[in-house]
Amino acid sequence: MLGLFNNSNSINGSGNNQDIDEIKREQMSNFDQFEDGLNNNNSNNNNNNNNSNNNNSNNNENINRKTGSTLLSSSTSQLNSSSGQISFSKDAVAPTKKRRYIVDKDHIFSWTPYCKAYWNKLINVYGVELEPPQLNVSAEKGFSFSEVDNSWIYYRRNHFQLGIGVSHCFQFLESSPPLISLNGSIYPVDDFYLCIRGVKNGPDVNINEEVEVELYQTNSKREKGEEKLPPPVLMTFSTNVTIPRLHFRKATANNARKHKLPNPQQEFFRLVLTVVARAQSRDFCITSMISDPLIVRTGHPTCNPVSNNPSTPGTPISNFDSSNNNNSSSSSSIINNNNNGISGYSPHTTVTTNSTTIIPTYGSGNNNNNNNNNNNNSSGNSSSTSPMVGPLGVVFPPSPINSLSNHNSPHLTPIQYNNNNNNSNNNSNNNNNNNNNNNNSNNNNNNSNNNNHQFQSNNRIFKGNLSNPFDLNYSQNSNNNNNNNNNNNNNNNNNNNNNNNNNNNNNNNNNNNNNNNNNNNNNNNNNNNIFSHNNNNNNNNNNNNNNNNNNNNNNNNNNNNNNNNNNNSQNIHFYNNNSNNNNNNNSSSSNNNNNNNNNNNNNNNKNNNNNGNNSQINEKHNLSSNSNSSGFTAELFSSIENTIRNNNFLTQKPHFPFDQTLHQLQFQAQNNQYDQINGKLDNIHNNSNNNSSNNNNSNNNSSNNNSNNNNNNNGSHTASVKRKLSNSYDQQNLEIESPQSYISSPTPYFVDNKQPQPQPQPQPQPQPQPQPQSQSQSQSQSQSQSQSQSQSQSQPIQQIVQQQLSSPTQFSQSEEVILSSPLQQQTIQSIQQQQPQQQVITNPLLQQPQQQQQNIISIGDMDKNIKWAQSPNGGLFHFGNVGVNSENPQEALSVNGNVSISGMMYQPSDKRVKENVKPVNSKDQLSNIMKLKIYDYQLTDEWVKSQNLTETKDRGVLAQDLNTPSNHIPNSVKHTGDRILGNGRVIKDFLVVNKDAIFLENVGATQELSKKVDNVCMELETLDKKKFEMLGHKMSELERTTIREIKKNQKRKKIFIGIGVFTLFVIFGLVAVSIVLGTRNTITKNITVYTTGSPGYLNGDCTDSESGSNSCYDSSSNSAIDTTTSTGSGSIK
């Protein structure tokens, strides 16, 4: 088939002697060859672009074979070529291998969001809204597009299948599952499910007109008896979901066309995909999508209007915007020129070959592939029939014969690729482009959305009281020169590693090589975070090879002062991991000016601005790269512990709490006292916290060691406490920058209205200041000085601790003491546990007797010893009973008056703190509730006035009724002792009622009633069953009786009929017998009639004799009348 279209001499119209069967066999064999050789050649096209000459020739061969078979199968009668004609009948069309997935050229079966108003939001444990799983739907088979109807067609007797790719935007953890917000309540999500249904709607989506239609799923055998509704599919951890063998049971209405045009009253079906979150055994919609309208037909029409390119496309659907993919490869540019304006869609089907599979992208556009494959070295042997290589090696053949295709090149749907690994293949093999370093400039947005799920998307600044619960704002900012996590991989030496190799080979040059490239590289302005993790890696390798004489090498690393200015204004927990590797290798010759070269050693210590840079943060943890995190804080508290133990501070009860003393010591030591001893401890901690390699042969130690603390309060707005440098540390030296300091600082502080009496304090010894050494001193002296500083670092700490122990201070309500870090708190707890309970004070600084001070708060006319403190969570606490409008609180909180609560009241009820747990008999609870009486009452005036009540009428129970043995509810009544009213009246043994106990008793009674109601319902159901059974029995008996009676009546009827018939026969027989007998025996009677003048009877001549009666004489005629009587005849003479 290679020569079928390329070589004009292989087949020449009617002159061809090749048999049709051979052509068919060749076509089928070429299919297998094409399947085997397609992917290997495609992989060579994408990867080995410089050696693409041979691969292009092989691809041309395979593609031309495929083109021949494809075009031959689509032809019906004739093929026109440049050399001749080829005539085939319809029976001679070569069979084409059925492909399951076909890429559509023109049409897109799209899905759009549906019913957004009914979507529920997903949030995490920090209250940040999460994106729901994104779906990429691929209608893999069953649908085809109709040009006439301008709609998608589905035939009811077929089945269709949906392949859904799921892209999870967050990780589902069973330990901390996502939460769903429902009417202000939050529930954990158990699993995610995918549901599908069919709806009836018009061409435009209208939710109000939605009617659900029957959509069924069959088994693999497609048995009608096994049809069922598509069940929900579990998709919690799935990335690919397939819903097979779906079909509509009914066709759409008004499918008939009018005048060969679409019916304006055409009915449409649509598919609806819904992602539900299952929580509390209920399903809640989190996202939903609806498909394009479908026309469901019963059978294929005679003239099929469906296009020749059935498609099963799908677009990536998400309720969140997704960024566009930047495919900058040479093959994609070809495809983009043939899109006819269609762009931004993902593949609609999955193209499967023997070794390569194109999987649709299920992401939200987080990955940007910048494949800079410059294929300018390929040979020019490719002809007009050379195949087009698509993305990922998919080859799409061109159409060499214009009469066989509608377009000269296929119109392919742009394909979006799944690149979760962010692989940027920068194969710049372009000999025509010498700027190879600039080929990586397209990689600016790699990994740009890898951290989409940071916990700071809300960016809410906490401004309320920390005693109230709030959502933590967690952020993990890894700013390795990445603004908004954009890795600018510009290979133009603009990285953090500023390797400034200044090779100065000239004489008398003033090389002021200031490394200004790192000034603002790592300024992490986390103004709204509560937890902040800042990892700043600044590697400044300054290799200044000065090989000439008289060079003034002022290579001052002044830029390091601003490298790590982490302006964390409202951070509560700050973890600062700063690693400043400043390798200053100054190899200068013998003629260099030592005065200028020695400045580099002192500038290395300027990297210590990380130690005190965030002194206003409440809890600071400086973690160095070598895991040496103790630093000054550990040494300070170690000295505090040793001083306290040596002075036997815990011998007796101090004049104020021990924790408060330690808080004051920590506070003063962490502020300006830290500044006083910072000069001596500076060089020591530089070596532990900053990897500074000072390879310098000079000995100049200037006084720039303390310059690193200039940025301690840079850009910080957190309220903090400052102390003035003075010899006495009393209350008057405290200053508060902001009156709202307690808002941003959840550290404990103590309330005290009365200022203590200032005690005479010993003056602290002046701290020795380090003096700069001369330039002529040797390097060994510099090293010995650093060792002496290391040995004497605890001396100023001991002085500070002793000074603080001798000058205890109290704090007022408007002042604030910053608590220590968790490390410091552990140190304090260990000191308290290890100290003996009874010792003797041996500290000479504490020998002076001091009067114990009390924290006094005025409440009405009484003064009570009340000590309030603030917990690390920001709440105030106090040990003892508290009364509101009550001078003598009997409980932890006694309130005289109304209490308004906007939230919920909770009580501890954990099973692990309870013993002897026994169930309560609900029958007894019901009996107690039945005995309980509710009253309407009015409070007395004296009680209302004494308790500051506003309502005098109420409804409730009487404590005396509950205190009787017959009606005893456990823990419902409490005796509170005598109560004195405002008028002096004393109520003996005042009783109060626990309504919670009554409520629980009512719950038990309700349960018992519920049981009884259930029993009654069960009995009623039993009675109903019995009634129905009895009625059934009666009905059946009546039916049987009726049937028996009917049968009896039928028998009687038959008997009566028989008897009647027999009677008739008897009657007729008797009549016949009588007739027969009557004809044989005739009875004759002679009647004589006499005719006289007057009848015998009338004349009186006739007698009463028989003869007289049988004969009469007619007097007129004197004639006798004879009468003969016989049966049936008579005669008269």
Swiss-Prot record:
Domain of life: Eukaryota
UniProt keyword annotation of Transmembrane present: yes
Bias type Low complexity, positions: 39-83, 317-384, 418-452, 473-615, 686-714, 772-808
Protein's GO biological process: positive regulation of DNA-templated transcription; protein autoprocessing
Transmembrane intervals: 1055-1075
Region (Disordered), start-end ranges: 33-83, 305-629, 679-723, 736-817, 1107-1133
UniProt membrane topology term: Single-pass membrane protein
Disruption phenotype: No visible phenotype.
Name of the featured protein: Uncharacterized protein DDB_G0292186
Organism: Dictyostelium discoideum
